[in-house]
Amino acid sequence: MRTIRFNNNRRISFSLFLREEGRRETSVSNASGDKIPKGKVPFLLLFFLLFLGSCSSDFLDNKPTDAVDSGLVPVPSNAERIFNGAWYNLFEYGTTYANIGYRALMCLDDMMADDVVSRPMYGFNSSYQFNDVVMPSDGRTTFAWYLMYKTIDNCNTAISIQATGDDDTPEFRHAQGQALTVRAFCYLHLAQHYQFTYLKDKNALCVPLYTEPTNPNTQPKGKATLEEIYTQIINDLNRAKGLLDGYVRPNDKSKYKPNTDVVNGLLARTYLLTGQWDEAAKAALEAAKGYTLMTDAKNYMGFNDISNTEWIWGHPQSVSQSDASYNFYYLDVVEPDSYNSFMADPHFKDTFTEGDIRLELFQWMREGYLGYRKFRIRSDQTGDIVIMRSAEMYLIAAEALARKGQLGEAVKPLNTLRNARGLADYDLTGKTQEQVIDEILMERRRELWGEGFGITDVLRTQRPVVRVALTDVEAAKEYDCWQQNGTFKKYHPEGHWFTSFPDGTKFVPNSKYYLYSIPEKETNANTNLK
């Protein structure tokens, strides 16, 4: 298992960095939520933005360093480099082995939901027990907050650049469009995790909304409403679409750079969250064009290659730049050196029907856990990270049309996906609108397992987390379980072992346990958040 050097000198409070100097204490959580001292973390005020200088336009080919490039200033010729720095921060910045970039938050979100069973190992065991991001003092709470706002601030710098004359090049406009897209992506994440869903109360206060670069004189803001945040997201994406018109990514390794397909995909997600069904379906189907669905389990297994025909947006990894790949050590259930933390609920497997190519991914293994061999780290210990793919877009279109009441139209994109997975068309005969929506939502769970949609779908649909322990009859069965040496050993099955909130109460809709907290250090520094 590889060693990673964490760039803790960049771990700066979004409010505190405006005025605090010197050194401060920081801590992280272990698998059970206990604190592990990390010691004193040094940082310099003005280095918050300057670290971007280490990220060149071909940063995915050359590992960025922590060196400060004093020549990097917010001018049109540097817009692409500043965007690349924002992207690198979002996916490669880490504070612990269990907190490396945005992929760690995707893991967290699925571990908190229905269909993942935690094999009690290092990494996300506390997330499974709703015992980390709900606590303002937790290290992961701190990591999640600063990861987003540092990325937003970097994007704001790129967006703020003005260009005229010869400086107003297509490359400059594309970089600004990409920065707008990533800013919208970050605010969409914040809106879904720090407040209940828009359709519950669009006037609910959520998080601060910053659209200009900050500096030591910036006054910390209070919380904006969900409506204000979603308005900004849609405005950013529509502006980005214009700037990215005509932009073509040169190759698959450039899929980290947003194009209009990515913008349409984010618009589809946003419109689904805000109940704009026609717009959601239209944007989703537009985003999916040209991204062919997989029809073979061999192509499905691994989920580590950005050249996958379904992938619209992803984060590539190379041997020289691969910190984000460490997240595969939690998801990969086969790799001997992995933590193998993410196992499947046996009841989840029961929702699949015969002929589904995804059934081949299930394997009883280890001490009786059900493995889902969807994610595999490559032999060079790297793995590309999926952010958006066409299967999700078909599901968004299906759900949006079903919620509008157009059931006949809704099953068309649903069946496109089902057929690709080896299944016959969904039989609409005698089905109610609610039944069709439920089937589409269940298909989302089957298709997007492990891709970071678990708890946000729970929040969006205002339902409770559902975890059902194995019955005595189910637990008494024995299965041949694959072992790492290639042999098989009989074990009783393992299912959900944490089926209520930490206070002992039952899972309910719209619970505080589903939301991320704002770090206490942030609320202490910014009284406008209280």
Segments (PLM) and residue ranges:
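Structural register within alpha-helical repeat arrays
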Residues: 176, 183, 190, 267, ...
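Extended ligand-binding clefts on enzyme/binding-domain cores
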Residues: 83, 91-95, 228, 274-275, ...
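Conserved, well-structured interaction surfaces
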Residues: 121-194, 224, 242-245, 380-385, ...
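Membrane-proximal, proline-rich intrinsically disordered regions
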Residues: 55-106, 352, 426, 430, ...
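Short, surface-exposed recognition loops and adjoining beta-strand edges that mediate ligand/DNA contacts
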Residues: 67-72, 97-118, 195-203, 207, ...
